[in-house]
Regions:
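Polar, enzyme-active/binding microenvironments
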Residues: 1-190
């Protein structure tokens, strides 16, 4: 698929549903969108066909779901400088993994990681039970990965604690916009 034919311009983040039969892509056109695609062969993007897109506001950078697909999370920012109003957003879905059923697209739960001095939040990941959240950001030429604990898994209204960060500027990455872990959490991919 190509961005022009895919209905989502300037794609940034990508994720799949639990069985790989659906793919989701965030785009930064017109205030941030999420596109949903059906895959006739699981995890084979060459078999993708466009299903729907939903405007979610902000400039959507990355996307993740909780384990049962009833919550969708995006890393997004508002403002041309990228750093202003960076947020992690939590959207409730009435039907698992179906972006057309977002309960209240205009009022998602939000967490503002800038309270701990991060820059533009781009990447977003969770551990398997959602009690740890990871973000990537860019601040003044430095690229970092931040780790947070959530008192309740996959719940941005729970107590969120910043556990620390590492500077990855010298690792050969250039402003990573996404991150993900292997199933047992021993390997991180940027």
């Amino acid at each position: 698929i190509t961005p022009a034919s895919a209905k989502v311009q300037y794609p940034r983040g990508i994720t799949f549903n639990d069985d790989g039969s659906k793919m989701y892509v965030t785009g930064t056109t017109s205030g941030g969108v999420v596109g949903m695609y059906s895959l006739t062969t699981n995890y084979d993007v060459s078999t993708a066909s466009f299903v729907a897109k939903t405007t979610i506001g902000g400039i959507a950078q990355d996307i993740r779901f909780n384990n049962d697909g009833t919550k969708m999370f995006t890393a997004a920012f508002n403002g041309s400088d990228g750093a202003s109003n960076s947020t992690i957003r939590e959207f409730a879905l009435n039907t698992a993994y179906d972006i057309r059923t977002i309960a209240d697209v205009d009022n998602p739960e939000e967490y503002n990681p800038q309270a701990i001095d991060t820059g533009q939040v781009d990447g977003l990941a969770f551990n398997n039970d959602g009690t740890k959240m990871y973000t990537t950001d860019r601040t003044d030429g430095a690229e970092k990965i931040h780790e947070y604990s959530l008192s309740t898994g996959f719940d941005l209204t729970s107590t969120i604690t910043h556990l620390g960060s590492i500077d990855i500027s010298g690792l050969g990455t250039l402003a990573p916009t996404s991150l993900i872990f292997n199933p047992d959490g021993t390997t991180m991919f940027l």
